[in-house]
From Swiss-Prot:
Signal peptide: none annotated. GO terms for biological process: phenylalanyl-tRNA aminoacylation. This is Phenylalanine--tRNA ligase beta subunit. Its cofactor is Mg(2+). GO terms for molecular function: ATP binding; magnesium ion binding; phenylalanine-tRNA ligase activity; tRNA binding.
Length: 810
């Protein structure tokens, strides 16, 4: 949005300098991108009157002019402009004057006393282009008759005016006009707002144009009037041309300029039809497939049912709310016109211009929303200017209202506004802010019920009103309050270690940390978690990142594949991250979302050689027991049980459930062969995933006395059915340690396993196996006697025999 400061100050004139006004607008959300002078610097250029014009004696295209420039003496100036004539007033550059450089960055053009074809010239008569006021170089810049002779041209044309360029956010459609900016300025500064003086024009004709609105979802209100006898060749007043140019709009013709002027002034695009080119009445409707329209810009567009049009009895005449058609365009020969101003529903205009690869000021405004209550007033304003400039006789305004927005009140709680803004704003001050913004409201204690005005399409929810309060209150008045945290010593729980310590421990065991998205491919969830109903994202950033993960296995395999594709041979990675599981038992809290558990887990993956290639170690592929050893070291001193179980992502015979104190805390094992084949992995990676809490918790270290007496070691071999797991025997022996007979048992370790191929002299059947355990016993108070040791060993054997049918091997 671009406009001159002088135009703005005709509506509101706060006691602020240009820079202060710019800062105030920016801090209220109307970002001023640039301030620039209306014209480049000039010196010694004044208003002069041409007194006499005679032909140059030695040049056909030059004239010798006598000029009164208010200096007390008549100046002789040689001029080649085709429109020079006695009596006109023009800008005169005196000797010593400086004009803007011909090219940007060049030196100013200095005027000197010179001779042109032997005739002395005491200055220069200037065109608008030479002053860098416009691109018009067809002749001299003719000034209004009432401009004082001798006045500095900068004062005469207000060239020290400042042009504001404001970057508006899409929701601020109410500021796409000078009056809209003025309305905001008045609210921000408290300066009085002078509304435009719009008076109804007396109708001298009774004629109206038949109008039918067939699409109320396209057009909610349509106002128009007939004006006859206009002079389309009338010259646009200099003040209007000046304002349009400083708003970035070139002058076209009086009728077009007036329509554009009111759009920049009040924010409503309008359209002027050549009445004599309209066939019958007009119909506001949706387009039809197969129809086409040649637009004012020369393009011909193909229409369909998604585009609104204005048609007459013969053809389509305009692209509704976007651009008029060429067939009814006004020309310099136009004498009768039909003036239209309407309310177009934003949804019916949005995106239609872009569909045809162009944009217009009208579409830019209508797709954001334009005041639907002022169509008649704007028709009256345009009519007033047309009659003043072009003459003519106006008919009555035909105003058809079929479907206007029903704006529901929006409630705002003052307490919530204060909490969000971060400062206590008095309720009376909030009421004053709403009054300054022109927002009608009802107040009920802490609650303000605001009815959005017709020009504010951006007020729909409570947060919109809170934004308005913050803007007008002033962001600069909101104090900067950095978060304050009390500095105090906090006790460290010695029974817990941080996740950072776990990261360091894994890094020390040659694992590299990786960080992955918490959202993954739905196929990963099926493959690695057996989950067909994951937590889905409402707005995923990519189709392959559409669900929240419930396991880290998929992310780790994804990292493995990424590295293998880059010719890595040995990969050891881990991740400490959260998974997301639907759980109705979870209640909402500061760090919790109702219905969803978000536990933190530690996952790791090892692939390839167990060690880097070297001369001192044999190369082999990493296996289950390598990774199990890493996990046991990570858990120490906690001892976990590894229970044979099946997981959808793990090898059926090489995977286990991890249990700590009887509670399942994770999984470990080789990747399932099916997934190896699917993800094209040459070897099986070994992975584990475990709850972070199981690794964080640790027992408080307790000192124990080192015995001065030697330990006793006994080996026992028991025969059991091959289906009996070693872990089950360990569990039974661990239970026996609670008995008094086994109180001196320090350690039990398996050191041998034997399986008979058939019934042999070993005394074992083919379905049995022999397990050899080494039992270490020690007493801190004295040397153990054989009787005590024998009793402990017998207790262990009896327990295994009672539960699993174990017998000592003979």
């Amino acid at each position: 949005m671009q406009f001159p400061e002088s135009w703005l100050r005709t509506f509101v004139d706060p006691q602020l300098t240009t820079d202060e006004l710019s800062h105030a607008l920016t801090m209220a959300g109307l970002e001023v991108e640039s301030l620039r002078p209306a014209a480049p610097p000039t010196e010694k250029i004044v208003v002069g009157r041409v007194l006499e014009v005679v032909k140059h004696p030695d040049a056909d295209k030059l004239n010798v002019c006598q000029v009164d420039a208010g200096t007390g003496a008549t100046l002789q100036i040689v001029c080649g402009a085709p429109n020079v004539a006695p009596g006109i007033k023009v800008p005169v550059a005196l000797v010593g004057a400086k004009l803007p450089p011909a090219e940007e960055g060049g030196a100013p053009f200095a005027i000197k006393l010179s001779k042109l074809r032997g005739v002395e010239s005491q200055g220069m008569l200037c065109s608008a282009r030479e002053l860098k006021l416009s691109e018009d170089h067809g002749g001299l810049m003719i000034l209004p008759e009432d401009t004082p002779v001798g006045q500095d041209i900068r004062d005469a044309l207000n060239l020290d005016d400042t042009v504001f360029e404001i970057k508006l956010t899409p929701n601020k459609a109410d500021c796409l006009s000078v009056f809209g900016i003025a309305r905001e300025t008045a609210a921000i500064t408290g300066a009085p707002l002078a509304a435009p003086d719009i008076r109804p024009v007396r109708a001298e004709l009774t004629e109206t144009l038949p109008v039918k609105i067939s699409a109320p979802d396209l057009c909610g209100r349509f106002s128009g009037r007939v004006i006859r006898g206009v002079n389309a060749r009338a010259k646009t007043p200099r003040w209007m041309v000046e304002r349009l140019e400083r708003a970035g709009q070139r002058s076209v013709s009086a009728l077009v300029d007036i329509s554009n002027y009111v759009m920049f002034e009040l924010g409503r695009p309008s359209h002027v039809f050549d009445l004599d080119k309209i066939h019958g009445g007009i119909d506001v409707r949706w387009g039809k497939r197969g129809e086409s329209l040649k637009l004012l810009n020369g393009n011909t567009v193909e229409l369909d049912e998604t585009v609104g049009v204005i048609s007459d009895d013969a053809q389509v005449e305009s692209l509704a709310g976007i651009m008029g058609g060429d067939s009814t365009a006004v020309t310099l020969d136009t004498t009768n016109i039909y003036l239209e101003a309407a309310f177009w529903w934003p949804d019916s205009i949005r995106g239609r211009a872009r569909k045809y690869n162009f944009s217009t000021d009208a579409a830019h405004r209508f797709e954001r929303g334009v005041d639907y209550s002022t169509t008649v007033e704007h028709v009256e304003r345009i009519t007033q200017l047309i009659l003043d400039i072009c003459g003519g006789q106006a008919g009555p305004v035909d105003d058809q209202i079929v479907n206007l927005p029903q704006r529901a009140p929006v409630s705002m709680r003052a307490s919530r506004a204060n909490r969000i803004i971060g400062v206590e704003i008095d309720k009376d001050e909030i009421a004053q802010i709403f009054t300054r913004l022109g927002l009608a409201f009802e107040r009920d204690g802490d609650v303000f019920r605001v009815t959005p005005p017709p020009h504010r399409f951006d007020i729909e929810i409570e947060e919109d009103l809170i934004e308005e309060v913050a803007r007008i209150y002033g962001f600069e008045k909101i104090p900067a309050r950095p978060p304050v945290a009390r500095s105090e010593m906090r006790a460290t729980d010695e029974t817990r270690r941080s996740v950072h310590a776990i990261r360091h421990a894994l890094a020390a065991r040659d694992y590299a940390e990786t960080v992955n998205f918490s959202f993954v491919d739905a196929e990963w969830e099926r493959d690695f978690a057996g989950n067909d109903n994951p937590v889905r994202l409402l707005n995923p950033i990519a189709s392959q990142l559409s669900v929240m993960r419930t396991t880290l296995f998929g992310s780790l395999v994804g990292v493995l594949r990424h590295n293998l594709n880059r010719r890595a041979e040995r990969v050891r990675v881990f991740e400490a991250g959260r998974v997301f599981i639907a759980d109705p038992a979870v209640k909402a809290g500061e760090l919790a979302v109702e219905g969803y558990a978000q536990p933190k887990r530690i996952g790791a993956l090892a692939y390839g050689p167990v060690v880097d290639e070297q001369w001192g170690a044999t190369t082999r592929q990493v296996d289950y027991f390598d990774v199990k050893g890493d996990l046991e070291a990570l858990l120490a001193p906690v001892v976990a049980r590894f229970v044979k179980a099946e997981h959808s992502a793990l090898h059926p015979g090489r995977g286990a459930r991890i249990e700590v104190d009887g509670r399942a805390v994770g999984w470990i094992g080789e990747l399932h062969p099916r997934l190896m084949q699917k993800y094209e992995l040459p070897h099986a990676p070994v992975m584990f995933e475990i709850d972070a809490d199981a690794l964080v918790a640790r027992a408080l270290p307790a000192p124990s006395e080192v015995s001065k007496f030697p330990p006793v070691r006994r080996d026992i071999a028991v025969v059991v059915d091959q289906k009996v797991e070693v872990q089950a025997l360990f569990d039974e022996m661990k239970k026996a340690l609670a008995e008094d007979a086994c109180k001196f048992v320090q350690k039990v370790a398996l050191f041998d396993e034997f399986r008979a191929k058939s019934n042999t002299s070993s005394g074992m059947s083919a379905h049995e196996k022999s397990l050899a355990f080494r039992v270490t016993l020690q007493d801190a108070a004295g040397t153990l006697q054989d009787e005590t040791v024998d009793q402990a060993i017998q207790t262990l054997v009896d327990r295994m025999a009672r539960v699993y049918g174990a017998r000592l091997r003979g």
